[in-house]
Design a protein with these regions (language model features):
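Non-catalytic, solvent-exposed segments at the cell envelope interface
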Residues: 2-240
Length: 240
């Protein structure tokens, strides 16, 4: 039961912090799962927010790190076919397929020189049912079905253009959740439960979700794709 609750609230991070925080529904699932102390282990202290979360497609076609600091958010795509910054001559995709999510998290953290506190492992081949439960989604003036959006995650992001498009989908779905009604959002939550795993506690996810609200609104959000031509410097590859 605790695991299912944790999976439910993973939507707080990737897609829809507003619903998980703003609705009573989120509070109903808090009892007996996680604690404030666990949340502070992720964020450092009650008042200072600084954490990194890995978002991985189970097919290995998209890896992103969401880095939250007080007042700003970075969404960084890591090209799956690229190799770690130092020490290994094998791709992140191969590391994930052969050694799993924990080793991938470790190598990405080393390459970015950032702390990565947890992960969300999402089967994006199931995104269709989630989006359709929301009644479709509009992105850049066009309405997409869930099946159309799945296409963005059916091959590895080998360049900045593909990685940027994948980020666009994640952010757009988040905004769509924020505008969804309570019952429609609840239905989509149940769909999302079936395609997500996480190692984060509910209390930590709720804190992260609250911090992500400005980013979903387009405030203080920096986007990047790494590495580009071997360059791991985030500041020189900012997309926005």
């Amino acid at each position: 039961m605790a695991k299912r609750i944790g999976v439910f609230v993973t939507i707080v991070l990737m897609i829809v912090p507003v619903l998980a925080i703003g609705l009573t529904l989120g509070g109903l699932f808090l009892a007996g799962t996680g604690s404030s102390e666990e949340a502070y282990e992720v964020f450092g202290s009650q008042n200072a927010l600084s954490t990194g979360i890995l978002l991985a497609d189970t097919g290995g076609n998209a890896f992103m790190v969401c880095v939250l600091e007080e007042g700003s958010t970075q969404l960084i795509s890591i090209l799956p076919t690229s190799t770690p910054k130092e020490g290994l001559n094998t791709s992140f995709l191969s590391i994930y397929q052969k050694e799993g999510i924990d080793r991938l998290k470790q190598e990405i953290a080393k390459s970015l020189s950032l702390k990565v506190d947890g992960y969300l492992e999402v089967d994006f081949s199931g995104l269709s049912s989630v989006v359709d439960a929301l009644g479709g989604m509009t992105m850049e003036g066009k309405t997409y079905t869930g099946q159309e959006l799945e296409g963005y995650f059916q091959r590895p992001s080998t360049d900045q253009t593909t990685a940027t498009a994948q980020q666009d989908v994640v952010l757009a779905v988040g905004r769509r959740f924020c505008s969804a009604g309570f019952w429609k959002g609840q239905k989509a939550f149940r769909k999302f439960m079936k395609i997500t795993e996480t190692d984060l506690s509910v209390s930590a996810l709720m804190k992260i979700g609250k911090a992500l609200i400005p980013a979903l609104e387009g405030k203080n959000l920096q986007r990047a794709c790494l590495p580009l031509e071997g360059n791991w410097n985030i500041s020189t590859t900012a997309l926005s």
